[in-house]
Amino acid sequence: MIKRLIDNLNYTFREFLIVSSVILLITLIVIKQSEFKSIDIFKGKQLHQGGYYIGKILKTPKNIFDSTIKTEFKNLNKVIEDNNLIKNGYPFIIYTSKTNEFIQYIAAIPINNCEKIKQPAKYVCNYFPKQDVLTVIHKGFLQDRNKGWEILENEIAKNEKKLLNAPFEVFWKGIEQSKDSTTWLTGLYYPIK
């Protein structure tokens, strides 16, 4: 009987060790992920090549902007499929105006050309011009990209640059390519003269 108690005690202790180890491992992973900080790298002046795009003109409250944009890119992909168009780059947003409450913008995806497209209401097919831009590469969480925009605004003020066109951002790598948000890449651009 004592042997059986010792065997049960050992079995329970082993279970305790296994469960404790798993909990410790999960805790370490969560702490490590919470330590990640998004990175913004100023790249200076670059040439953005431009090209044709199909997009939708939108005005969204700031507090639901990030969730709305995911839906709008899905809708744009459907329009591209329905019109048998070929994507020619990464999805992007052209910011036409911002207030404290709303963001007005064009959610867009590059395509080869704008011929023979059945455009639903509020959709546009246009050419985005080749232009000089100040660039910041944002790596990490999308909700942290405001620091990148601040870097661009400070550079414009410091160097007395003039905006030539609406600012825009390109989503190079996002949730569609990787669930690991620490690897997401977004290009932030201010067109300049």
Where does each model-flagged region fall?
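A solvent-exposed interaction/effector surface
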Residues: 2-193
